[in-house]
């Protein structure tokens, strides 16, 4: 039986009196890129932490390939780039990729990782010598070393200029074209519109709308206008 890469079923998460997720539902299908779109504090990072097994839901169920996210078998099929990701600045790009690849039984070939992540030509440079956009692409490369079936990207383009952001978009789409699934959290509406097969708008811990970017936009003048209307309800 084939299970969806990720499934949240009526998931809630409370921290004291704060409800970070509130009866949250989301299923990510194979081969699709889902953008979880919301303002700061909407619950995006909480959802990611629960999916990665770093936090447990207060109520509801979370499944990663049909299993508990804490199980090694399901985690081995997952890659992630978190906002807090840090790697040593003195290692070269190739050295980082070689090290991370050694953790997996069947990693992607070095050449393929460099090509997908757009790192060809800078693989011998030290991480600390790279621009912010290049460093983000290295973190993306490390997340795909294990050839994951599901990639989780938590606000991957925060702090990047427009050129670097669009460059990373290209690398993300290249990975999806391999038939993989991606969960992307973002508060950039242009990012969701450019990348996503499906957008889930989250507000105060609850999914308030889901659909293609065009469906979310509806009759509004722009996706931004539709988003503002949705979170104002």
Whereabouts are the PLM-identified features?
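Conserved ABC transporter NBD signature motif
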Residues: 60-74
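Conserved ABC ATPase signature
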Residues: 126-130
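ABC ATPase "signature
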Residues: 210-211
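Conserved ABC ATPase "signature" region
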Residues: 98, 102, 107-123
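Catalytic Walker B motif of ABC-type/P-loop ATPase nucleotide-binding domains
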Residues: 151-155
């Amino acid at each position: 039986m084939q299970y969806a890469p990720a499934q949240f079923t009526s998931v809630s998460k409370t921290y004291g009196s704060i409800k970070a997720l509130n009866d949250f539902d989301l299923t990510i299908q194979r081969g699709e890129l889902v953008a979880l779109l919301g303002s700061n504090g909407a619950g995006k990072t909480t959802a990611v932490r629960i999916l990665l097994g770093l936090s447990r839901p207060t109520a509801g169920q979370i499944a990663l390939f049909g299993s508990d996210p804490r199980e090694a078998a399901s985690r081995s099929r997952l890659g992630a780039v978190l906002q807090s990701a840090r790697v040593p600045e003195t290692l070269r790009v190739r050295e980082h990729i070689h090290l991370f690849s050694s953790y997996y039984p069947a990693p992607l070939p070095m050449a393929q990782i460099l090509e997908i992540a757009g790192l060809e030509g800078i693989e011998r440079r030290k991480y600390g010598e790279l621009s912010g956009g290049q460093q983000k692409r290295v973190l993306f490369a490390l997340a795909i070393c294990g050839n994951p079936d599901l990639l989780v990207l938590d606000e991957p383009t925060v702090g990047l200029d427009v050129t670097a952001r669009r460059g990373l978009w290209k690398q993300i789409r290249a990975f999806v074209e391999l038939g993989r699934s991606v969960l992307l959290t973002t508060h950039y509406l242009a990012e969701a519109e450019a990348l996503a097969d499906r957008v889930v708008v989250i507000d105060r811990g609850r999914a308030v709308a889901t659909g293609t970017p065009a469906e979310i936009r509806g009759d509004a003048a722009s996706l931004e206008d539709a988003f503002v209307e949705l979170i104002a309800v």
